[in-house]
Regions:
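Short, hydrophobic-rich beta-strand element in sensory/regulatory alpha-beta domains
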Residues: 43-47, 51-61, 193
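GAF sensory/regulatory domain recognition
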Residues: 56-79
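Acidic/proline- and glycine-rich, intrinsically disordered low-complexity segments
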Residues: 71-106
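Signal-transmission/dimerization alpha-helices at domain junctions
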Residues: 139-140, 148-167
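Helix-to-coil/beta transition segments that act as allosteric "coupling" elements at the rims
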Residues: 105-130
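Regulatory loop-to-helix N-cap segments in sensory/regulatory domains
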Residues: 2-9, 122-124, 132-151
Length: 200
C-alpha cells in the first residue's frame, strides 16, 4: 500500500475505495455509533494513503464538545473531557467543515493539543455539527494532502449519516402508517344485489 512518503496519491481512486468501504458498514443503531465505526474503519484501512493515523470523537454538549472515544493510534484520552465550542480551531472547523492548523497558527493552544497527544489540529465537522472528529497526522504528510484526506472523510461520513437518517424517517413513517390502519378489514353487513327484469 502506498504511504504518504510515496505521494502523489490518486485521490479520485482513494475516494472511491473509501466510499466502497463505507457502503459495507451496516447500520449500528445511532449516529454516534455510526460516526465512530466509520471513522475507525476508514483509518484502519487507509491510514497510509490518508496520512491520518488515529483520532478522537467529540460530541456537542451545550457550549462544549466532549470526548466520547479515541481510535487508531491516538493517545488515550479520558472520556468526558471537554473543549469549548469557542476554541478557535473548533470554531474554524464548525465554520468551514474542515480545518488544519499548525502549532504556531493563531488561536492554537499548544499545551492543550500536546495533552491530547498531537501537534497539529486537523479535524472535520459531521452530522450537522453534532460531532467533530480530530485526527492525529502522519508527520511526513503535507498540509494539502491532509486537507484532501479530511474532505474525503467528511464527505463519506456525512453521506452515511444522511443515508441512515433518511432510512429512519421512512421506518418511522411506516410505523405511523401501520398504527393508523386497521389490523384486519372491518366487517360489513351482507348485502343483496337485485337485478331488475327488463319489460318490453
Amino acid at each position: 500500500m502506498p504511504t504518504v512518503a510515496d505521494r502523489p496519491v490518486d485521490y479520485r481512486e482513494l475516494m472511491k475505495k473509501v466510499e466502497r468501504l463505507v457502503a459495507t458498514i451496516q447500520k449500528l443503531g445511532d449516529v454516534e455509533a455510526t460516526v465512530r465505526r466509520v471513522a475507525a474503519e476508514i483509518i484502519a484501512q487507509f491510514r497510509d494513503e490518508l496520512g491520518l493515523v488515529g483520532g478522537r470523537v467529540y460530541q456537542r454538549d451545550g457550549s462544549d464538545y466532549v470526548v466520547r472515544d479515541t481510535f487508531g493510534d491516538a493517545k488515550p484520552v479520558e472520556a468526558g473531557r471537554r473543549v469549548p465550542r469557542a476554541y478557535a480551531p473548533i470554531d474554524a472547523c464548525i465554520q468551514n467543515g474542515v480545518v488544519y492548523m499548525e502549532p504556531d497558527d493563531p488561536g492554537v493552544d499548544r499545551a492543550l493539543e500536546e495533552s491530547l497527544g498531537v501537534r497539529e489540529f486537523a479535524c472535520i465537522e459531521v452530522a450537522d455539527e453534532d460531532y467533530i472528529l480530530a485526527f492525529n497526522v502522519d508527520p511526513v504528510a503535507s498540509r494539502d494532502d491532509i486537507v484532501f484526506s479530511l474532505q474525503i472523510l467528511r464527505n463519506a461520513i456525512n453521506q452515511k449519516v444522511r443515508q441512515e437518517r433518511i432510512e429512519e424517517v421512512f421506518r418511522e413513517a411506516r410505523k405511523i402508517q401501520s398504527s393508523i390502519l386497521p389490523r384486519k378489514a372491518p366487517p360489513y353487513p351482507p348485502f343483496e344485489m337485485e337485478i331488475g327484469r327488463a319489460h318490453v
